[in-house]
């Protein structure tokens, strides 16, 4: 494939946009550099770039797209609402309707508030938990990404009883000292951290199924034990379901796993491709948010009618029978084919799959926690990424990310993808 126009536009972009991208994950730095492909439009499972190349898309905007690009039902809903106005600054019927549909799908959301991003949603749940418990410290799990607010850009200390350090310039040490980071799926480390800091902890922040170092499921009993220990110390459990809500079934991962938090942050999929975030949970906790309580959260664009209408339309598509069963079937077809090719070419790799989402890791370890992904073969992934891109398969340019299937992918797309993998693996020996 030729990417002449993408390369030209990237040079132009560098003149005006810092680093040439509006989010660092869009650069190709993690896969050896080069100009990222500039896309012009998307339809269904496909993206089309400025050079006229067509791609089967498994990036799907890092997770928000589950019904394919430019889904006609969602597109029409957005167009109809845009004709009526995109922002009023007042309450609307749409936000009531959307909240009702969300609570019907995720019963733990006794009360709901909308914001504009997953970062805002997580940031606010932390503030609410602190207001409710009158404590300051937070526990998070290594490798889980919870947005770019100061409190969650914190690296692990040298052990479970050690406080964190800033994971980004501009995050004060004083902020990092309010955060403890422990390994996911390691209940003993969590026990140790709570034993040391539990009386000061406001909440633990958990991805119930991890989506930010690939797709990683909790070990049996892990989430249940986290809930038990957390509540024993009077702290709250916050689930970050920004990636997982409506990804695996019509509802949240908590319902699938039958383990429930006190508060939930959500976003991505529920906006139908438009900017959105939200949070909700137990009524007695949520009542600490203004205007009923002292914890402040506001937003000019929060609950805007365009995002609300898109979200309603998205749920109308997903609530149809058979949607998630088909995603699971496609995911299994892709996984089975990848495993067969790994064996055929003697590639050192493993796969984690959760329904219609999976990650291919270049390691022989079964992935259960972040350090294993950190130590996986990044050079092999970078080579694989470029080989796939040049065959028209669009993946995330990072060994930490998942492949996302949509309602618009077909068996033929999977088969074409596997042909590309077959060739890529043949060039990696």
UniProtKB/Swiss-Prot annotation:
Q: Name one GO cellular component term.
A: cytoplasm
Which GO MF terms does the UniProt record name?
glutamate-1-semialdehyde 2,1-aminomutase activity; pyridoxal phosphate binding; transaminase activity
What cofactor is needed? pyridoxal 5'-phosphate
List N6-(pyridoxal phosphate)lysine occurrences by residue.
Answer: 268
Q: Which PROSITE patterns match?
A: AA_TRANSFER_CLASS_3
- GO biological process: one example: protoporphyrinogen IX biosynthetic process
What residue range is the signal peptide? none
- Catalyses which reaction(s): (S)-4-amino-5-oxopentanoate = 5-aminolevulinate
User: Where found?
Assistant: Cytoplasm
The record's annotation in Gene3D superfamilies points to:
Aspartate Aminotransferase, domain 1, Type I PLP-dependent aspartate aminotransferase-like (Major domain)
The protein's matches in Pfam families, at most eight in alphabetical order, are given as: Aminotran_3 (PF00202)
InterPro entries noted in UniProt: 4pyrrol_synth_GluAld_NH2Trfase, Aminotrans_3, Aminotrans_3_PPA_site, PyrdxlP-dep_Trfase, PyrdxlP-dep_Trfase_major, PyrdxlP-dep_Trfase_small
Keywords of the record, alphabetical order, are:
Cytoplasm, Isomerase, Porphyrin biosynthesis, Pyridoxal phosphate
Q: Main localization of the protein?
A: cytoplasm
Q: What is its EC number?
A: 5.4.3.8
Q: PANTHER family from the xrefs?
A: GLUTAMATE-1-SEMIALDEHYDE 2,1-AMINOMUTASE, GLUTAMATE-1-SEMIALDEHYDE 2,1-AMINOMUTASE 2
Assembly, in brief, is: Homodimer.
Can you tell me which family this protein belongs to?
Answer: Belongs to the class-III pyridoxal-phosphate-dependent aminotransferase family. HemL subfamily.
**Name of the featured protein:** Glutamate-1-semialdehyde 2,1-aminomutase 1
